[in-house]
């Protein structure tokens, strides 16, 4: 434990925490031609590559992901949630933060139902997350 004189010389500093989605925390200022710090809940980007990856040890599947170049110039790996998708190279997508626990290096999710990412077809429950419209009531 520090003495009073030690605390007078150098005060206690609070620990700074790193952001979990760093690509959402800055944008690119075209006029000044440099990065500008401001946080965004989502960012738009263009798919560079759409492919699959196998998850970490206890799980087994082919998880779909896309490499996306964002509007601020950074390049990130984003997960494509839901069953089936129509994304391909040069598709416009909207991404938000949120990691996938069993895919290393994937810190972002693509938002379904916006831009070129179509919603999941025939989805009845949890539709909001997958951009699915409410089904018509049957008579």
From Swiss-Prot:
3-methylthioaspartic acid modifications at: 102
Gene Ontology CC terms: small ribosomal subunit
PROSITE patterns assigned to the protein according to its UniProt record, in alphabetical order: RIBOSOMAL_S12
GO biological process: translation
Gene3D superfamilies documented for this protein: Nucleic acid-binding proteins
GO molecular function, one term: rRNA binding
UniProtKB keywords: Methylation, Ribonucleoprotein, Ribosomal protein, RNA-binding, rRNA-binding, tRNA-binding
Quaternary structure and partners: Part of the 30S ribosomal subunit. Contacts proteins S8 and S17. May interact with IF1 in the 30S initiation complex.
NCBIfam families: rpsL_bact (TIGR00981)
Family: Belongs to the universal ribosomal protein uS12 family.
Function: With S4 and S5 plays an important role in translational accuracy. Interacts with and stabilizes bases of the 16S rRNA that are involved in tRNA selection in the A site and with the mRNA backbone. Located at the interface of the 30S and 50S subunits, it traverses the body of the 30S subunit contacting proteins on the other side and probably holding the rRNA structure together. The combined cluster of proteins S8, S12 and S17 appears to hold together the shoulder and platform of the 30S subunit.
UniProt protein name: Small ribosomal subunit protein uS12
Source species: Phytoplasma australiense
């Amino acid at each position: 434990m520090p003495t009073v004189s030690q605390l007078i010389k150098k005060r206690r500093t609070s620990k700074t925490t790193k952001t979990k989605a760093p690509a959402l925390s800055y944008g690119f200022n075209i006029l000044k031609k440099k990065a500008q710090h401001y946080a965004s809940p989502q960012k738009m980007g263009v798919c560079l590559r759409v492919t699959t990856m196998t998850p970490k040890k206890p799980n087994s599947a082919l998880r779909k992901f896309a490499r996306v170049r964002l509007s601020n110039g950074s390049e990130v790996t984003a997960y494509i949630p839901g069953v089936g998708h129509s994304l391909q190279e040069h598709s416009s997508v909207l991404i938000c933060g949120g990691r996938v626990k069993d895919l290393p290096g994937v810190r972002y999710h693509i938002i379904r139902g916006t831009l070129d990412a179509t919603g999941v077809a025939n989805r009845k429950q949890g539709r909001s997350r997958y951009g699915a419209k409410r089904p018509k009531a049957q008579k």
